[in-house]
Curated annotation (Swiss-Prot):
Gene responsible for this protein: psaE
Annotated organism of origin: Synechococcus sp. (strain RCC307)
Annotated NCBIfam families: PRK02749.1 (NF002745)
Family: Belongs to the PsaE family.
Pfam family, one: PSI_PsaE
Entry membrane topology: Peripheral membrane protein
Name of the molecule in the record: Photosystem I reaction center subunit IV
Tree of life domain: Bacteria
Keyword set includes Thylakoid: yes
The keyword Nucleus is assigned to this record: no
Gene Ontology biological-process annotations: photosynthesis
Subcellular location: Cellular thylakoid membrane
Function in brief: Stabilizes the interaction between PsaC and the PSI core, assists the docking of the ferredoxin to PSI and interacts with ferredoxin-NADP oxidoreductase.
UniProtKB keywords: Membrane, Photosynthesis, Photosystem I, Thylakoid
Gene Ontology CC terms, in alphabetical order: photosystem I reaction center; plasma membrane-derived thylakoid membrane
Length: 69
């Protein structure tokens, strides 16, 4: 599967906060790291302070954990 920057992908990592969610590929690292694909999402996760907007909206994934959306 060839994933490139800007593609919409569905997350297939069961333990991920974004499991089965759709995100956009922000970048792909070619240096050989374990999780080279950075995916950006519309919503943020649960990391943040109470009453304050914030959290993380990107995460790294392996290509095998992504399906085209």
């Amino acid at each position: 599967m060839a994933i490139s920057r800007g593609d919409k992908v569905r997350i297939r990592r069961p333990e991920s906060y974004w499991f089965n969610e759709v995100g956009t590929v922000a970048s792909i690292d070619t240096s050989g790291i374990r999780y080279p694909v950075v995916v950006r999402f519309e919503k943020v996760n649960y990391n943040g302070f109470s009453g304050v907007d914030g959290g993380i909206n990107t995460n790294n994934f392996a290509e095998a954990e992504l399906d085209p959306a």
